[in-house]
Amino acid sequence: HTDSSFKKIPAKYSLLSARNISKVGGNTEFADMRNAYDSLEIKTKDKIDKMICEHSLIYSRQRLGFDMVKELSSDEIKNFTPVEQPLVRKNKATNRKTIFLSSHIGKIKNWIRPDSMCFIDDLIEYSTQLKFKYIHEWSINDLIIWDNRQTMHRARAYDDLKENRDMRRTTVLGEEKLI
């Protein structure tokens, strides 16, 4: 996922530090969305360059099996109204394009939801290939800083019933709306 993509002004950077780690598992994977974009076929770049996606925390929780209608009040649901974000962003400093993917995407604008999700899932699968990834194996006191504008990340499984893991995260707000 990408941190806070469901907010009107998405996160710029995130920092994660390890206070206590699991003995097995619990790695964090980062995918470079710049290189993923660069390696796409031209026809795919042309297709996605102007796409707009709806992001919401509700979408990502539903994908995990949560029934958000039962678990949230109507006021809480209003707080997670989908936010439109471009599927492709351009870094103003480098002029380099990047795919702005996240598990918080629930729909591509003007597409039906099933087609949207199939397309997004295929794009995520492509963009998270090993050739685009850095896998961090945690040590105590590690601090990782990443740019949410050009990466996706995910934590890998560990035995949270048997192991105590203490990770501290800070998220830096972005500077502007993307749309």
Regions found by a protein language model. Give the residues of each.
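Non-heme Fe(II) oxygenase catalytic core, chiefly the N-lobe of the double-stranded beta-helix
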Residues: 1-143, 148-179
